[in-house]
Amino acid sequence: MLGKIALEEAFALPRFEEKTRWWASLFSVDPEIEHADKYGVGYQILSYTAPGVQDIWDPVEAQAGEVGVDRILSIDYPFETFEDAAVVLRRDVQTYGFIGALVNDTQRTGPMGNNQEEAYNINDYIAEQIRDKPDRFGAFTLSMHNPQEAGRDNAARLFERNPTGTIYEKLGAFRDYDAKVKAEITDINKLRIENASWDIFWQTDTEAQALAVEDADVWFDGAEFYDNAAMQYVIAYGAKQADIYGPINHWFEDRLLGLAETCKWLVGPDLSFAHGVSLHVLGMTVNGVFDR
């Protein structure tokens, strides 16, 4: 029985092979399935590796389209405000039976610098690659940029790809403030999901469940520990982020050295994601998000 689900399995576009070689391998369906079978993974949720849409600061450049094929969902919603994002989300929940999205950190700067067509290319590419394996692969992301043009394009492309509007994915995740790790950030609180600015997103989640959506779960994508600690330090003490990464990394590494042999496999994303997710949930709890 293949009872495991793998999240954020990275893929890249073939024409960016050189640029992404040191980030992640290119995506190939057959080897992925062979590897998944070997380790008991029944379903993989794919995520385009950096550099990608989520690494493009300019909203126009990052604007993306939405495609859906059976259980395949590949979404890049560019949004500028939480309110605008919720409007488009609510529309698609009601119109297309859309029940989920993964919100990624998509307003940070990155090395790619391509236009909105790049996002379309990414979605089109992965949709074609996994079209014949809807029971084994899914792909989706939700970008936080300007929605005006993207909303209309997304809906049109979704209908083009999947006339029935049938999309099967669980309700996605909300990644916090590392979307804007830039020197000009002065108020980290406005970018965290326990802030009241995010309430309209959680309201959309509630409405989706009220529409008899089954398994409308929330998946949290925890921020990296280094970004969390470094940015908190920047806000509190006004230091440049680059100046404090070294000490923070050394501090973290010192504590990792004390991990038991049985826990050494947690070093890296597993440990940092656990830290980020716990901050999300505890922050939402003490700030009354679940109560509201």
From Swiss-Prot:
Keywords: Decarboxylase, Lyase. GO terms for biological process: benzoate catabolic process via hydroxylation. It is an enzyme of class 4 (lyase). Pathway: Aromatic compound metabolism; benzoate degradation via hydroxylation. One of its GO terms (molecular function) is o-pyrocatechuate decarboxylase activity. It comes from the Eukaryota. SUPFAM superfamilies: Metallo-dependent hydrolases (SSF51556). The keyword Lyase applies. The active site is at C263. Its EC number is 4.1.1.46. It catalyses: 2,3-dihydroxybenzoate + H(+) = catechol + CO2. Belongs to the metallo-dependent hydrolases superfamily. Homotetramer. The MW of the complete protein is about 38 kDa (345 residues). This is 2,3-dihydroxybenzoate decarboxylase.
